[in-house]
């Protein structure tokens, strides 16, 4: 964030704001999450507490990381490491798992939390990379036939 940027309160337009840290509680997909030292601003004029865009992005990353930890899911860094160790591109992994475009990118940069099924599949492939050719073969057999008019 630009440290020269002047922060003002959106409620009362005062520039008497102070950066604070406090516990922030939220729910992410019905999972309760508490971030102990969330950075935010408090207006000294009206008492409003708010986040800048950068603080909000940082808090969102912290919340998603906490949810991953609490649910026992792989971190974005581990997903990237597993994919690279398997020699797969992001597009190949998306095709292999039947995912939409850019889903793996979002997992790896932490913007989206992978589901339990994908997490287990990644762990299995990490434990036994020999499953990769078997998975590819199974996918070629299970694809619906092309319909020609």
Question: How should each PLM-predicted stretch be described?
Answer:
Residues 116-136:
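DNA major-groove recognition helix of helix-turn-helix/homeodomain DNA-binding modules
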Residues 135-149:
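Short, charged recognition helix plus adjacent turn
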Residues 52-117:
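Extended interfacial segments that mediate partner engagement and assembly in macromolecular machines
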Residues 27-37:
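Short linker/helix segments within small regulatory modules
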Residues 6, 40:
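Residues immediately within or flanking Cys/His clusters that coordinate Zn2+
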Residues 13-16, 50:
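Cys/His-rich microdomains that often coordinate metals
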Residues 9-12, 43:
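Short cysteine-rich clusters marking metal-coordination/redox-active sites
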């Amino acid at each position: 964030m630009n440290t020269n940027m002047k922060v003002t309160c959106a409620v009362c337009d005062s520039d008497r704001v102070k950066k604070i840290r406090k516990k922030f509680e939220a729910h992410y997909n019905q999972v309760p999450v508490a971030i102990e030292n969330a950075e935010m601003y408090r207006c000294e004029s009206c008492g409003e507490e708010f986040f800048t865009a950068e603080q909000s992005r940082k808090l969102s990353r912290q919340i998603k990381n906490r949810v991953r930890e609490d649910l026992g899911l792989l971190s974005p860094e581990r997903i990237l490491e597993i994919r690279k160790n398997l020699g797969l591109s992001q597009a190949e992994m998306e095709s292999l798992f039947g995912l939409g475009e850019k889903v793996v990118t979002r997992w790896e940069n932490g913007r989206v939390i992978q589901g339990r099924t994908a997490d287990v599949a990644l762990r299995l492939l990490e434990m036994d990379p020999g499953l990769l050719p078997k998975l590819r073969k199974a996918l070629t057999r299970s694809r619906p036939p092309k319909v020609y008019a």
